[in-house]
Curated annotation (Swiss-Prot):
Alphabetized UniProt keyword annotations: Cytoplasm, Detoxification, Methyltransferase, S-adenosyl-L-methionine, Transferase
NCBIfam families, alphabetized: GntF_guanitoxin
Gene3D superfamilies (alphabetical): Vaccinia Virus protein VP39
Record's subunit section: Monomer.
PROSITE patterns: NNMT_PNMT_TEMT, SAM_MT_NNMT_PNMT_TEMT
UniProt KW Cell division keyword: no
One GO-annotated biological process of the protein: methylation
Name of the protein: Indolethylamine N-methyltransferase
Binding site for S-adenosyl-L-methionine: Y20, Y25, G63, S64, Y69, D85, N90, D142, V143, L163
Length: 263
């Protein structure tokens, strides 16, 4: 794309949550690559955080954007969830849903799908309330800082989750590797990183705005996770991709990795 990499200032000024949600999270029952991508992530997260999966006390979601779908499974297995995003608008959108404010985005179809995966299709309202009770805070984050949640300081977490965010925040492979190390600093030794990364994606559209990404190969993501001090427990590469007009990626990579114990 022209004009250089879209950094934090551009996101703060031009990233409109409702345009983003309308493009990627409509989930109205009609088939689309975007709906299939959402289902892929919900299914992976259900398997990761469902019965017999990861559990603990604290989970930090980095780069939440204006979305809550990514913690629907985790709210059953963690007691304290932190959501975070760089932009004011995205954090405001999250707070609006958490506080049931008028005009909040309607996640009902997505919550119902998550409940179906859990075998509780009729309990979507209870699921929403469980999630609202489990999310304890919404913080600003910047993955390029040594403490991505600064100035907030949280105890080391049992799990860090980041979906479809890191590749959009980093302008190069080196920046991505450094950001992963920053995320690792938020975890306890033995804690888990759970991430989905779009592969070979150089930019994506939000409304009429184009936002840049670092185009990553699966092998680069895998090596970056290892270099950040993790052992990879699961790596799933899928050809799942978005509509070419929205985000011309070439598959995705879902990873569960465990932070190595300290010396």
């Amino acid at each position: 794309m022209e004009g250089g990499f879209t950094g934090g200032d551009e996101y703060q000024k031009h990233f409109l949550p409702r345009d983003y949600l309308a493009t990627y999270y409509s989930f109205d029952g009609s088939p689309s690559p975007e709906a299939e991508m959402l289902k892929f992530n919900l299914e992976c997260l259900h398997k990761t955080f469902g019965p017999g999966g990861l559990q603990g006390d604290t989970l930090i979601d980095i780069g939440s954007g204006p979305t809550i779908y990514q913690v629907l499974a985790a709210c059953e297995s963690f007691q304290d969830i932190t959501l975070s995003d760089f932009t004011d608008r995205n954090r405001e959108e999250l707070e609006k849903w958490l506080k049931k404010e008028p005009g909040a985005y309607d996640w009902t179809p997505v919550v119902k799908f998550a409940c179906e995966l859990e075998g509780n299709s009729g309990q979507w309202e209870e699921k929403e309330e469980k999630l609202r009770a489990t999310v304890k805070r919404v913080l600003k984050c910047d993955v390029h800082l040594g403490n991505p949640l600064a100035p907030a300081v949280l105890p080391p977490a049992d799990c860090v989750l980041t979906l479809l965010a890191m590749e959009c925040a980093c302008c190069s492979l080196d920046a991505y590797c450094a950001a992963l190390c920053n995320l690792a600093s938020l975890l306890k030794p033995g804690g888990h990183l759970v991430t989905t990364v779009t592969l070979r994606l150089s930019s994506y559209m939000v409304g009429k705005r184009e936002f840049s990404c670092v185009a990553l190969e699966k092998e680069e993501v895998e090596q970056a996770v290892l270099d950040a001090g993790f052992d990879i427990e699961q790596l799933l590469q899928s050809p799942q991709s978005y509509s070419v007009t929205n985000a011309a990626n070439n598959g995705v990579c879902f990873i569960v990795a465990r932070k190595k114990p300290g010396p």
